[in-house]
Amino acid sequence: MDKETARQRAAVLPGSFDPLTIGHYDIVRRAAKIFDRVYLTVFVNSAKKTMFSLRERTEMVNLVADEFPNVTGDVAECLLADYACERNAVVIKGVRGMIDFDYELNLSHLNRRINSETDTLLMPARQEYMEVSSTFVRELLRYERDVSRYVPPAVGRYLKERQNRL
């Protein structure tokens, strides 16, 4: 890592992004204002059944990353603690309520056990996005309902194009 990269304030915003929602987008937007570099990273979790392929999730992440000069879309197949440490970055997680908070707090402790340098910043979701989740969006998509209110515009266009191809 060069000296410039070491001085930058960097953050990793990890997820499966199946799909990326307006809530994720808001966290990215807010993180991009705070950090010099944000890694919007699709983490591969082989135990998780996804609606969208890794390629599709990566494409959606890149559409959002392209909107911000300091956000980079990425894919990782490793431990989050190792990924963050390699980039000298903090982990940012959005939390919608106490259930998310408790879950993410426990994960932050586990990440610290893996790598003591791993810090996690929990960012509260804005009230208007508290009920939005990828699970909810997937359910709407299964029934061919409009999801444009729940995903960023670029992701909405992507999903519409994908639906037209099917």
Give short role names for the model-derived ranges.
Residues M1-L166:
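Nucleotidyltransferase catalytic core that binds NTPs
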